UniProtKB/Swiss-Prot annotation:
Protein name (Swiss-Prot/TrEMBL): Glutamyl-tRNA reductase
GO process terms (BP): protoporphyrinogen IX biosynthetic process from glutamate
Similarity section: Belongs to the glutamyl-tRNA reductase family.
Gene that specifies this protein: hemA
Domain remark in the UniProt entry: Possesses an unusual extended V-shaped dimeric structure with each monomer consisting of three distinct domains arranged along a curved 'spinal' alpha-helix. The N-terminal catalytic domain specifically recognizes the glutamate moiety of the substrate. The second domain is the NADPH-binding domain, and the third C-terminal domain is responsible for dimerization.
Length: 418
């Protein structure tokens, strides 16, 4: 049995290839069935995200194994083999285990240390459990990767610092406000960055969010997801006083929030502080707002400096994480090697028990016929000893005849002889 990890990711393949190799969720069961129908495949998990498509497999060794699996992948997606081979990576046993642990821990992600990948790996594993997982070693490898990812998050600072604009904006808000559960947040825009911000805020228990956007329909989709209220851009002036935090990211060529608007809001708030995070380019908030007392304005450049600092911290944490992965990989491979001996141990024990049962039955039969108990017990002990040492004795004799001292020493060690 061999463990494999093969696939492509954002480092090896452009999006034009990644989208062709991806597995759609509605056809994943069909793909897994097709994969497990391959004679060499004992178990499989398919991980397919926007940044990677990977197959994790337990397989029987055979000639042309790599070619057979690449051919299946190309046939399934109707791809040219040469196009795929240039971007494909292939990891086996120790390297496959290490790769999965690194992926689950966020060490192989586009954004170093990002936590979302662990959920994606867990989902891929759960999908494979629906009648597709047949290899206990593969299952154990995934379970181990989950515990390693948790250990990496617990013992290092890999996820402690914001390295995306959206996450940095939320981190800044959490640093300034003791609790986000009691604040009101105004989000201006409804694009991808604001979507991420809204989800981060929801995770941190923000109860009241207002989304202001040019088109109500797009904003409403996000609002329904995070439980927010939707208003028009024209209503910002009137509603601004309600907001403790304003995070803005639109494509407007001109500022949406001016100094006068913020002055009026602060006056209505009796100068309770406001945090304004402007992550738009061009800027959505007039720079003069930052000069107002109790208005704390941060631009995208301010966030980038935070991100750069935090990325350096994550890279340092990643070094610690790699050490954990190396240690855990070594321990898992030791367990795997021990498993390979378990079948031999079971067979050896079964053979010994069969000999014991056979000779014990004969001894009991002799006792029932009135035979001498002491003689029967001595005969049982003698025969049992001879039967159990017969095969090891022959192996020792053969090793001695062959002059194979290494094998002789291994046999002596196995038999507990000094």
């Amino acid at each position: 049995m061999t463990l494999l990890a093969l696939g492509i990711n954002h480092k090896t393949a452009p999006v034009s290839l990644r989208e062709r190799v991806s597995f759609s969720p509605d056809k994943l069961d069909q793909a897994l069935d097709s994969l497990l129908a391959q004679p060499m495949v004992q178990g499989g998990v398919v991980l397919s995200t926007c940044n990677r498509t990977e197959l994790y497999l337990s397989v029987e060794e055979q000639d042309n194994l790599q070619e057979a699996l690449i051919r299946w992948l190309c046939d399934y997606h109707n791809l040219n083999e040469e196009d795929l081979r240039k971007s494909l990576y292939w990891h086996q046993d120790n390297d496959a285990v290490s790769h999965l642990m690194r992926v689950a821990s966020g060490l192989d992600s586009l954004v170093l240390g990002e936590p979302q990948i662990l959920g994606q790996v867990k989902k891929a594993f759960a999908d494979s459990q629906k009648g597709h997982m047949k290899a206990s070693e593969l299952e154990r490898m995934f379970q181990k990767s989950f515990s390693v990812a948790k250990r990496v998050r617990t013992e290092t600072d890999i996820g402690a610092s914001a390295v995306s604009v959206a996450f940095a904006a939320c981190t800044l808000a959490r640093q300034i406000f003791e609790s986000l559960s009691t604040v009101t947040v105004l989000l201006v825009g409804a694009g991808e960055t604001i979507e991420l911000v809204a989800r981060h805020l929801r995770e941190h228990k923000v109860q009241k969010m207002i989304i202001a956007n040019r088109t109500r329909e797009r904003a409403q989709i996000l609002a329904d997801e995070v439980g927010a209220e939707v208003i028009a851009l024209s209503e910002i002036d009137e509603r601004l006083r309600e907001a403790d935090i304003i995070i803005s990211s639109t494509a407007s060529p001109l500022p949406i929030i001016g100094k006068g608007m913020v002055e009026r809001a602060l006056k209505s708030r009796r100068n309770q502080p406001m945090l304004l995070v402007d992550i738009a380019v061009p800027r959505d908030v007039e720079p003069e707002v930052g000069k107002l007392a109790n208005a704390y304005l941060y631009s995208v450049d301010d966030l980038q400096s935070i991100i750069s600092h935090n990325l350096a911290q994550r890279k340092a944490a990643a070094v610690e994480a790699e050490t954990i992965v190396a240690q855990e990989t070594s321990e898992f491979m030791a367990w795997l090697r021990a498993q390979s001996a378990s079948e031999t141990i079971r067979e050896y024990r079964s053979q010994a028990e069969q000999v014991r049962d056979e000779l014990t039955a004969k001894a009991l039969a002799a006792l029932e016929q009135g035979g001498d108990a002491q003689a029967i017990m001595q005969d049982l002990a003698w025969k049992l000893t001879n039967r159990l040492i017969h095969a090891p004795t022959k192996s020792l004799q053969q090793a001695a005849r062959d002059g194979d001292n290494e094998r002789l020493n291994i046999l002596r060690d196995s038999l507990g002889l000094e």
